[in-house]
Every structure is written in structure tokens, then in C-alpha cells.
Amino acid sequence: MVSDNSGNLYIVAAPSGGGKTSLVKKLIEMVGEIEVSVSHTTRPMRPGEKEGVDYFFIDEEQFISMVNEGAFIEHAKVFNHWYGTSVAQINKRLQFGIDVVLDIDWQGAEQIRHSYPDAVSVFIIPPSLDTLKERLMNRRQDKDNVISERMTKAQDELGHYPEFDYLIVNDDFEKAAMELQSIVIANRLRIEKQVNKQAKLLSFLLSSQ
């Protein structure tokens, strides 16, 4: 259980190629007091990625060992590679009043919601399947058969949108980024958050009547 003084937890999910990672990076750049939770994965490091920044890259034996130790709040196998979110990473930040955003898939989102029912979830969708395929091809990271597999899986993933609190269409990146930022800012201004954060001001204003 987290108090009203704790940070907020945000879940951002999308089908592969939906642009969630780029949108989350933009969110971190533009909004203060929010950090992305760095997941563990068994997949190979991609060009431009950094250890401990994009992911903690570990082998399958290490990953399974962490699962058995209860180190992950959620974990799932996606395209033959494991991904997991550290319990300690999330809780430590939330307890210090820092907002945390999770860049995960719908399976991970489902598991997170069971443990953190107050988490705010956002699903990112492409404007069309053709656009999604074009983005996957432009990444130049996967072979044609892998792209076909990702497209097939994407159609299944898109069917999970009703499980989320918010839906953003990533057609215009800047517009989508602003919409994601707006969700975070609006959630911070909810009464149950502000009543403690602004307790002194509210007390002063009311006592002055």
C-alpha cells in the first residue's frame, strides 16, 4: 500500500513498433520528478543501447534465478526473450515520492495492475497497420520473417486496448508526446494527491476565513 505522498506509477504499453519507448523518453525529458524503470532482459543489446540505461542485459540462467528469488513484480517471454520489472526499483522510487513509468507490453501491464491497482495505464496505437509495418522495417533490426511475426502479434495485442485507462494514437509524434505528458500532469493534480502536497497552503487559506 502506498500513501498519498508517494509517487505515481504509470504503465505505457504498445505493440512492437508503436513508438512507446520514444514517447517515454520524451516524457522523461519534458516532465520533472519522473523516472523510467529499467527492466531486465535476456535479449541481445541493440545498436545505441546502453547497459543500465535501456535495460539490464543478463543471460537466461541469471533471469530464471531472479524469478525464483521473487525479484520481479512482472515478467514475460516476448519473441523468445525474457523481460522482467524489478520490485525493488519501483518501490524505492515510489516511497521517495518519485513518479515511475514502466515501458512494458500488455502482459506485463496486466500483472502490474494486480499489484498496483492505482497505477495509471496508457496504451499507444499506430494510425494504421501499414504505418506500424513501415516503422518496424525502418528500424532495420529484424529480418522479414521476424517482422511478419511481430505484425501478427500486434493484431492480437491491439485487442487489449479496453484494459487500459487511456488510449493515444501515435500518428503525430509531438501531439502524442503532449497527450502523454498531459495524462501525467493531470494525474498529479488529483485531489487525493494535492490534499497532502498542499496541506499547509490549504490550512492557511481556510484558517484565514
Curated annotation (Swiss-Prot):
Domain of life from the UniProt record: Bacteria
Entry keyword annotation includes rRNA processing: no
Protein keywords: ATP-binding, Cytoplasm, Kinase, Nucleotide-binding, Transferase
Domain spans labelled Guanylate kinase-like: 7-185
EC number(s) stated in the UniProt entry for this protein: 2.7.4.8
GO MF assignments: ATP binding; guanylate kinase activity
SUPFAM superfamilies, sorted: P-loop containing nucleoside triphosphate hydrolases
Record localization: Cytoplasm
InterPro entries: GK/Ca_channel_bsu, Guanylate_kin-like_dom, Guanylate_kinase, Guanylate_kinase_CS, P-loop_NTPase
Reaction(s) catalysed (UniProt annotation): GMP + ATP = GDP + ADP
Keyword 4Fe-4S: no
Subcellular location, principal: cytoplasm
Pfam families, per the entry: Guanylate_kin
Gene Ontology CC entries for this record: cytosol
Chain positions recorded as ATP binding sites: A14, P15, S16, G17, G18, G19, K20, T21
NCBIfam families, A to Z: guanyl_kin
Function according to Swiss-Prot or TrEMBL: Essential for recycling GMP and indirectly, cGMP.
Family: Belongs to the guanylate kinase family.
Name of the protein in its database record: Guanylate kinase
Organism name: Legionella pneumophila (strain Paris)
